[in-house]
Each structure stands twice: as C-alpha cells, then as structure tokens.
Regions:
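Non-catalytic interface/linker regions that flank or bridge core catalytic/transmembrane domains
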Residues: 1-3
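Divalent metal-dependent catalytic cores for phosphoryl transfer on phosphate-bearing substrates
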Residues: 6-13, 36-151
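A short, charge-rich alpha-helical start-of-domain segment used by transcription regulators
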Residues: 17-19
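N-terminal glycine-rich anion-binding loops that anchor highly charged ligand groups
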Residues: 22
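Short, well-ordered amphipathic alpha-helical segments that serve as non-catalytic structural scaffolds
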Residues: 29-30, 89
C-alpha cells in the first residue's frame, strides 16, 4: 500500500481544492462514525480519503481505466455515468494505490449507490460522503442527526 503521506499528496494534486477538502472532511467524519460504531478507524480514514480519487477523470478516462483493468460496469452505472467514479476509484485504489483490503475497496465502490447487505464500513462511507461538514443541502441536518440512532 502507498504511504498515507504520499497518497494524501497525490490526491491533493489530482483533485480540485474543493474535492480534496471534501475528501479530507469525509475521512474525518468517517473516523468519528467508526469510533461510534466500533469499526476500524484506519480503514474508515483511508476509505474516506480515497473515495473520490477518480472524480477528476473524464468519462473516456474512466472507460479506459476500466478496460485497462478488465473491469465491466453494470448496466446502472453505464446508464448513470455520474456514479462511475466510484467503481473506477476502487480500481485506482487497488491497482495504483496498492489497497488490497476488500472492505475498503467495497466502501469506495458503493459510496454513491447503496446495496443490500452493506457492511458497517460501507454504510459509514456512504453516510459520511453525504453528511460531512461542508455539505449544505435540504435534509443534511436530518442525515447528521440520524447517525446517532445507528447505521
């Protein structure tokens, strides 16, 4: 696995300042939630930091990355390219950043679209992405408060 400091530096260069700041906030929110629910804080931090690592890529770059790693998108992802960065982010995390923990990879992969049977880590990243402190939309406070009731 790539050293955390190097990973952080790389992300700060490839992501916009706003996206990088969002990723940092997600990682901190994820750590806070992991502490609440007994989930590994290191995995929560890493998944939160990396979750949007492919967000800067164009559609064509994401398609090319998937082909390079022989990955096939499901129909929903192809129909909604705005969520494609989650699958590609998991590929980058695995093949370019050296993450081999399937729990972290799945938390990245499913941070945009929930699935049946999500792990606690997956739920944490899914919620932290929506509820981190920079987010400002109708209903965000309700999401933040609902965390106290459990995952």
């Amino acid at each position: 696995m790539m050293d955390i400091a190097l990973l952080d530096e790389k992300l700060s260069k490839v992501l916009s300042e706003k996206r990088y700041t969002h990723s940092v906030y997600v990682s901190h929110t994820a750590v806070d939630m992991a502490k609440m629910f007994g989930v590994d804080i290191n995995k929560a931090f890493l998944a939160g930091l990396i979750h949007d690592c492919a967000k800067y890529m164009s559609y064509d770059e994401m398609i090319d990355t998937a082909k390079r790693y022989e990955y096939t998108f499901d129909g929903m992802t192809l129909a909604c390219p705005g969520i494609m960065h989650a699958d590609v982010g998991a590929l980058l995390a695995q093949y370019e950043y050296g993450i081999d923990d399937t729990g972290i990879l799945d938390a990245i992969r499913y941070h945009t679209v929930a699935r049946v049977g999500m792990t606690s880590l997956e739920k944490i990243i899914y919620i932290a992405d929506m509820a981190e402190p920079m987010r400002d939309f109708d209903g965000v406070e309700k999401i933040r408060k609902s965390v106290d009731g459990g995952l």
